[in-house]
């Protein structure tokens, strides 16, 4: 049950990221069907760089991806039916997590939902430019999740915390 829950958790999170990339890529490409002025190109460059750094590197590579992999490894090593059944939600830190992790996971999710709603009101090419940045960040995130997941399940010691409540009781 543990390994199946871990696989389900990682697959579910990967599908969530992949689905967003799949849905946003055509909108990003559509932006290029419009005539770009110099300021569109400048904004595109800034957005791509910012999203690669802030979302891809800082958000995913330094935080989300290693934590998701660590939580999937936790399911494998500490199998519980609810954790396995709700693997993607467990891996994203929505339950059986430290209080800080749950608050952060829920807050970030709501923030993303609000940003998605707001960006939908933008006209092209602005929406496509922002979506291009999001695709870059999500792509970076998906690749980093695959790499960290591989490391978590092949290394003897994975150095990232799953941020589960039991860790706080030993300190």
Label for each model-derived stretch:
Residues 146-171:
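Cytosolic/matrix-facing juxtamembrane and C-terminal tails of multi-pass cellular membrane proteins
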Residues 32-70, 144-148:
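Hydrophobic alpha-helical membrane-embedded segments
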Residues 138, 143-144:
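Surface-exposed extracytoplasmic segments
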